Amino acid sequence: GESTHMTSWQVSGRDVFEAIAKTMIGRPVVGEYALEDMALDLERLLDRLSIRRAHVVGISMGGMIAQVFAAQCPNRAATLTSISSAVGNPRTGFGNLRAIAAVAMTGSDGNSAAQHYTHILRTLAGPQYPPSEAELTEAAKLKLAYDAEATRRQLIALLASGNRSRQVRELTAPTLVIHGRDDPLLPFKAGEETAALIRGAKLIAVDGLGHQLAPALMESYVRWIAEHCHAHPA
């Protein structure tokens, strides 16, 4: 995850912006791993836990991993819920530069990294769901071990997977797409595209929501996902 320590591989913010630039002009990006590898981790975890089928839910990059898992293991994804995510299409999946820079140009270790993480939360939040000071303080505590390089490695990993539109179009798992209309990192049109590509997918558009899991909407998230899963039992 974002806080995984792999100090032997140094990745700079410049590397991330170069990878983004390559994606924008259609050039391939090479990373140490890609979304497909991370989806394989999920498959192996389910094997280890002896779980044959699962309801797969992911937000942002996690949503992309969930999409890839549902494509690679169609018989094991009972449902798919893709939240604030995208399919890797550079025409729809890039938000504003300020949001991209906030994620790519992360802070250093310890307290400065935690402070920068609160900056990310403020930058990515939607106008109707700004994070409270209490939420920011708690998030900072949880991110004292935040690994900036891990975040940048993961950004390169998702760019290395390229445009997955064709793969996503072939998904058969019942799919729910949830996306904020004011997402500055992965624009709402990315969520619209995801839902349009998958046959029978349902799109829930949330006004005023950015690239975030807003605590004020937690009951709604639970209800939406529970209804989706209950409609398609594993």
Protein language model annotation of sequence segments:
Residues 201-234:
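Catalytic active-site module of serine/aspartate enzymes centered on a nucleophile-bearing elbow/loop
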Residues 63-74, 80:
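Short glycine-enriched nucleophile-adjacent loop
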Residues 171, 177-179:
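Short beta-strand/loop motif that positions the catalytic acidic residue
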Residues 95-166, 173, 193:
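Alpha/beta-hydrolase
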Residues 71, 80-108:
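Flexible "cap/lid" loop of the alpha/beta hydrolase fold
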Residues 36-54:
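Conserved acidic catalytic loop of the alpha/beta-hydrolase fold
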Residues 1-33:
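Glycine-rich "HGGG/HGxG" loop immediately N-terminal to the catalytic nucleophile
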Residues 182-186:
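Acidic catalytic loop of the alpha/beta-hydrolase fold
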